[in-house]
Amino acid sequence: FTGFDTDRTMLRISAMNLMLHSITHPKIEYKDSVSKQNDISGKYDVILANPPFKGTIDAESIHDNLKNVTNTKKTELLFLALFLRMLKKGGRCACIVPDGVLFGSSKAHQSIRREIIENNQLRAVISMPSGVFKPYAGVSTAVLVFTRTGAGGTDQVWFYDMKADGFSLDDKRSEIAEN
């Protein structure tokens, strides 16, 4: 198990969580994942991620090979490019993205989608309702599931529209009894 963050509190919480689940030697590092200091490539079999979105990063600090995939400062696109780079061939990723990744019209949005479908196998797109991450974020999100293959593929993509998750979609996120 490996993880990176620039928030030391999140690093401690992550390490404690892994230890509580009997993961004895996690590799949790203080590192800016999309910066030039992170040059990991083709290393991981599985990536599960809820990357930061709706943010930007200083262009000078972004690793050049991420800019080659999608020339942007938007975190939600840079992290997708990072996951594609870090996966081994045959490696799988499931990550949460804002709907803008799916529907954005900028060149950066188009280039990351093109990379996913032309050079990887898109397996699933799971649309989630806008309140599922409240009170932290109120945007509509989706889970993208893909496999790094080196060749494109969208012939068997599972699409699912999740209407609810068993909790109210307001800021209180109360459990719904009839579930």
Question: Where do the model's predicted regions map?
Answer:
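Conserved SAM-binding motif I beta-strand of class I
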Residues: 1-5
